[in-house]
């Protein structure tokens, strides 16, 4: 009996050991055993055993939940994470001593989205050796998702912008602009910016006063040519037709729209021929020039440089909307006698800077019609020369009017319309024109207007003497001795824009011509003949005149005068202020001063 019991116990123990060995088979890479695992129900169906047998049978109970967690973990890993390329291909090669890695075939196929970023070093090992890190890693990727989503939304929003607007945002260009003193500034502009907009930008950057007289000048030093850009011209387009040595200048030009202010004073009757009867009025003259249906003609004699030669020939030329013609037979304007000299459509008219020296011109009142392209030959230039400055101004103005027409008048009207649309509080509190200034007598209890010109002149002289007395009292109070006045009055004028220092007469005339031959344009400079004196250079009726300002002494004080001591001023600032309000001995009042701005 005992032998039978012992044999049955040994057979039971061997069966349990075989069951335990089967449950502890090593796991493969996918977490499955090498042989089929018996179910839990079949295990529980065995008869009751001893406590030792229960302890041995309890071991597989903990293996199944762990295996189930690994299977769930594997499903979570393959479903929640995106397809990420393996950053450690050497680990997947089965090198000895290296931990196992996930096979690429076990991952889902890559989606159509852009590939995700690689894991940082060490991440592949952490996900295999420490499965509990999966939740934190997945959460970390879920936190990064809004950032990627935001970038995607931004890219989609940018892609919805029209192509024309995208090109406008991308097309920017740097333009270098020079001032009269040689300084320069590089400005980044849009490709569709006009000359007026660029001038306003430069006025803002250089802290100047925007009086709508600033212009952009196209300057060609090698050709000796320059012209003012029209306000509507595109700067980048003009720059594309300029050679590399050419440049833009930032300058004043008070005469740009002088024709619209005084059109009757521009063209003599013998220069203009109308296709219809004109009464000669100012409004009719403007309408005939600006109306595209009208056909005005500007004719007269000009010196024309012969092509391929240094000689000039006097020809009778005629300017029409279709171009510039010259007559082969005297002053005849018959079609068979007219030959085309230059086209207006694809050309621009320039001033000759030094035509007499560079092109052997008869005088310094030259013009040039240049094609609008970067590379040109000398034979393509049409060099012209007028008799005087007034005739040259008429031809230059006629060329602009016939080429641009109403567009030129709109450029003139835009600043005035902006002033009318400006809010009342932005306008100056006091705006007085020169025509509204009258002489007043305040000697009595009630002020009265002085109508007699002789009495008005005497009142102006008395005002000048009153200024002299006030300045004398100020000098006495500010100086220790009346015999040694303060040196401030002798140098304070150097801080003003209208004072140009030690320049020659020719240089002062050149500056006046560049900034427009309008009445009242002036500048002050040091005298070359008298070291203690100054010179007032003034433009009147398109002619430049010079007036010497001499120092004089009175009661031990030094004064400055223009009229041999009749009107004296303690400094040049007072002198300029006085003649801006009073004509005195000058042909006209001082209206505009020549200025040079450093960019």
From Swiss-Prot:
A Gene Ontology term for the protein's cellular component: cytoplasm
Record PTM Phosphoserine, positions in chain: 50, 98, 433, 436, 481
One matching Pfam family: RA_2
Ranges for domain SH2: 498-594
Cellular location(s): Cytoplasm
InterPro entries referenced in this protein's UniProt entry, alphabetically: BPS-dom (IPR015042), GRB/APBB1IP (IPR039664), Grb10_SH2 (IPR035037), PH-like_dom_sf (IPR011993), PH_APBB1IP (IPR039665), PH_domain (IPR001849), RA_dom (IPR000159), SH2 (IPR000980)
GO biological process terms, semicolon-separated: ERK1 and ERK2 cascade; gene expression; insulin receptor signaling pathway; insulin-like growth factor receptor signaling pathway; negative regulation of D-glucose import; negative regulation of glycogen biosynthetic process; negative regulation of insulin receptor signaling pathway; negative regulation of Wnt signaling pathway
Biased composition (Pro residues): 97-118
Alphabetized GO MF terms: insulin receptor binding; protein-macromolecule adaptor activity; signaling receptor complex adaptor activity
Protein known as: Growth factor receptor-bound protein 10
């Amino acid at each position: 009996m005992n032998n039978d019991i012992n044999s049955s116990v040994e057979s039971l123990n061997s069966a349990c050991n075989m069951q335990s060995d089967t449950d502890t088979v090593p796991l493969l890479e996918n977490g499955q055993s090498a042989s089929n695992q018996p179910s839990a129900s079949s295990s529980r169906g065995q008869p009751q055993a001893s406590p030792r047998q229960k302890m041995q049978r309890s071991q597989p109970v903990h293996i199944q939940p762990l295996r189930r967690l690994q299977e769930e973990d594997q499903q979570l890993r393959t479903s929640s994470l995106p397809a990420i390329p393996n950053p450690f291909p050497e680990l997947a090669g089965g090198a000895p001593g290296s931990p196992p890695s996930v096979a690429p075939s076990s991952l889902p196929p890559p989606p159509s989205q852009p590939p995700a970023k690689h894991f940082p070093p060490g991440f592949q090992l952490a996900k295999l050796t420490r499965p509990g890190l999966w939740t934190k890693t997945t959460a970390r990727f879920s936190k990064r998702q809004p950032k990627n989503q935001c970038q995607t939304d931004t890219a989609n929003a940018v892609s919805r912008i029209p192509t024309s607007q995208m090109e406008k945002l991308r097309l920017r260009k740097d333009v270098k602009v020079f001032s009269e003193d040689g300084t320069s500034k590089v400005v980044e502009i849009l490709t569709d910016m006009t000359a007026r907009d660029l001038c306003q930008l430069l006025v803002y950057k250089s802290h100047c006063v925007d009086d709508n007289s600033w212009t952009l000048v196209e300057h060609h030093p090698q050709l000796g040519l320059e012209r003012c850009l029209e306000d509507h011209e595109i700067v980048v387009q003009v720059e594309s037709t300029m050679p590399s040595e050419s440049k833009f200048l930032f300058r004043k030009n008070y005469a740009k729209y002088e024709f619209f202010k005084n059109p009757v004073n521009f063209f003599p009757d013998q220069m203009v021929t109308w296709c219809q009867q004109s009464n000669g009025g100012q409004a009719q003259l403007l309408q005939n020039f600006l109306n595209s249906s009208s056909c005005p003609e500007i004719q007269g004699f000009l010196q024309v440089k012969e092509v391929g030669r240094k000689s000039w020939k006097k020809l009778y030329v005629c300017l029409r909307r279709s171009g510039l013609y010259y007559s082969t037979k005297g002053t005849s304007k018959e079609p068979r006698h007219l030959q085309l000299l230059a086209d207006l459509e694809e050309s621009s008219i320039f001033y000759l800077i030094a035509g007499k020296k560079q092109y052997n011109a008869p005088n310094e009142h030259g013009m040039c019609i240049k094609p609008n392209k970067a590379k040109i030959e000398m034979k393509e230039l049409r060099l012209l020369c007028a008799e005087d400055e007034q005739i040259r101004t008429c031809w230059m103005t006629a060329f602009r009017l016939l080429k641009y027409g109403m567009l030129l008048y709109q450029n003139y009207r835009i600043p005035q319309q902006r002033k009318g649309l400006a809010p009342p509080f932005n306008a100056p509190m006091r705006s007085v024109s020169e025509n509204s200034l009258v002489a007043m007598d305040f000697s009595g209890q009630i002020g009265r207007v002085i109508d007699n010109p002789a009495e008005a002149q005497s009142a102006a002289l008395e005002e000048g003497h009153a200024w002299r007395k006030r300045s004398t009292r100020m000098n006495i109070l500010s100086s220790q001795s009346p015999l040694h006045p303060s040196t401030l009055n002798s140098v304070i004028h150097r801080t003003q824009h209208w004072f140009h220092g030690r320049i020659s007469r020719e240089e002062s005339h050149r500056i006046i011509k560049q900034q427009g031959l309008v009445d009242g344009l002036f500048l002050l400079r040091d005298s070359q003949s008298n070291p203690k004196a100054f010179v007032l250079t003034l433009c009147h009726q398109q002619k430049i005149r010079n007036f010497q300002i001499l120092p004089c002494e009175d009661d031990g004080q030094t004064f400055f005068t223009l009229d041999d001591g009749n009107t004296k001023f303690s400094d040049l600032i007072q002198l300029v202020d006085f003649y801006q309000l009073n004509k005195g001995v000058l042909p006209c009042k001082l209206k505009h001063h020549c200025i040079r701005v450093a960019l």
